[in-house]
Amino acid sequence: MTSTPLPRLILGSSSPYRRELLERLRLTFEVAVPDINETPLAGESPEATALRLSLNKAQAIAQRHPDALIIGSDQVLTLDGRQMGKPGSHDKAREQLRLMRGRTATFHSALCLLDGRTGQSQLADVQTRVTMRDLTDAEIDAYLRLEKPYDVAGSAKSEGLGIALLSRVESDDPTALVGLPLIALTSMLRQSGYPFFAA
């Protein structure tokens, strides 16, 4: 009896942090960068935004690689119900960190595993509550000069020096905060026939 070969696995992300997380699973995968509009829709909840964008990213890659299994992911940060994206500049990053100091924000880390062959998708949203230390303006500016976290939601790279900005992290998945929830992903991959610990 012959087993069906597994489809190619593609990570649809430009993030080096997500790539590093996926490498932990010791699976062979490729990386492709999706090109989509990431603007939130009017009235859309943070969870809905993150889930929609993770699906859209996977679908964009599937158009180019219809024979593959594609991982799409997105992360949306909320504070008091307000969505906060990637700052893109020093001034906006400073503003974000000033707003969050001493307070608790929620990261929605959405994940999509899309089978390009069938169009079937699995979706999950893993939430992480993060409490910031009560940082001084000088600490915020020093951190921003050192790490330049302008490409991450919330302006704090928890996988780097940004961990020193935090006083508490609450999540069901320790990898969700970095942007790729591996517990949810391994469950999805198992359902798609990917073996872990195969002899």
Swiss-Prot record:
Nucleoside triphosphate pyrophosphatase that hydrolyzes 7-methyl-GTP (m(7)GTP). May have a dual role in cell division arrest and in preventing the incorporation of modified nucleotides into cellular nucleic acids. It comes from Cupriavidus pinatubonensis (strain JMP 134 / LMG 1197) (Cupriavidus necator (strain JMP 134)). This is 7-methyl-GTP pyrophosphatase. Keywords: Cytoplasm, Hydrolase, Nucleotide metabolism. CDD domains: Maf. Its cofactor is a divalent metal cation. It is found in: Cytoplasm. Coiled coil: none annotated.
